[in-house]
């Protein structure tokens, strides 16, 4: 559900919270690194290079006064300073990778001149240009209509498979998670209450997961009233 802490966890992995925020985990292991105890200088070598994060809505993530191609190139230049010609070539290459037609024309466009689907593809290009090992996708299709959503998800799935990337996919859409993910962590009030293979979601054991699934509308088996999730205080402590 909204407010369960999904995006909070994704941002915590990249130390994107303000300094006053408290992370309760004793460690956050990524390959050979404990992200919890890295300095800001060390995190700059991880953030955007080894781990990238795709945000929810490109309208709020892209700079409105800089053409989108330069924003993609900037992600490359952050980790390879001074190589502007190579950065532009890489940005054009990434626009082709994310299946944007006429990449040289789109490179010069500003965020208000592109569609929502193009914007999310550009965000994906920006996050992949540094060849990361892990992508955190924070509800990357929530702002898109259904047909464009499926196109972007198909593209993301192809890129993850072909490049051998790890993917943390954050979503509140159980049916989407069921079809797109391998394993699911179900969160409630900032806690993981169940870890389950996506193919086994119909056999979930935790009452919260069961309640979420049971409250979904079903076109094949219509019900006049959807059940209301009955919450239990024990979910906060078990």
Go through the PLM ranges and name each one.
Residues 34, 86-105, 213-214:
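Conserved ABC ATPase "signature" region
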Residues 72, 124, 135, 148, ...:
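Hydrophobic anchor residue at the start of the ABC signature
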Residues 177-179:
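A short, surface-exposed alpha-helical micro-motif characterized by mixed small hydrophobic
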Residues 101-105, 196-238:
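Short catalytic/signature loops enriched in Gly
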């Amino acid at each position: 559900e909204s407010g369960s802490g999904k995006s909070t966890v994704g941002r915590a992995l990249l130390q994107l919270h303000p300094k006053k925020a408290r992370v309760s985990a004793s460690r956050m292991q990524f390959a050979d690194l404990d992200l919890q105890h890295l300095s800001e200088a060390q995190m700059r070598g991880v953030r955007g290079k080894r781990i990238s994060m795709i945000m929810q809505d490109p309208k709020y993530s892209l700079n409105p006064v800089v053409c989108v191609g330069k924003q993609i190139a900037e992600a490359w230049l952050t980790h390879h300073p001074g190589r502007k010609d190579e950065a532009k070539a890489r940005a054009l290459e990434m626009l082709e990778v994310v299946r944007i037609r006429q990449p040289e024309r789109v490179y010069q466009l500003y965020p208000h001149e592109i569609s929502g689907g193009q914007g999310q593809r550009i965000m994906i290009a920006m996050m992949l240009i540094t060849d990361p090992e892990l992508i955190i996708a924070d509800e990357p299709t929530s702002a898109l209509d259904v047909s464009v959503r499926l196109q972007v998800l198909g593209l993301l799935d192809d890129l993850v498979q072909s490049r051998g990337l790890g993917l943390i996919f954050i979503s509140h859409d159980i049916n989407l998670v069921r079809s797109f993910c391998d394993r699911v962590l179900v969160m409630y009030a900032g806690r993981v209450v169940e870890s389950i293979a996506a193919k086994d979601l119909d056999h979930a054991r935790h009452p919260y997961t069961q309640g979420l699934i049971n409250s979904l509308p079903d076109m094949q088996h219509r019900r006049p009233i959807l059940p209301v999730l009955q919450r239990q205080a024990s979910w906060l402590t078990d």
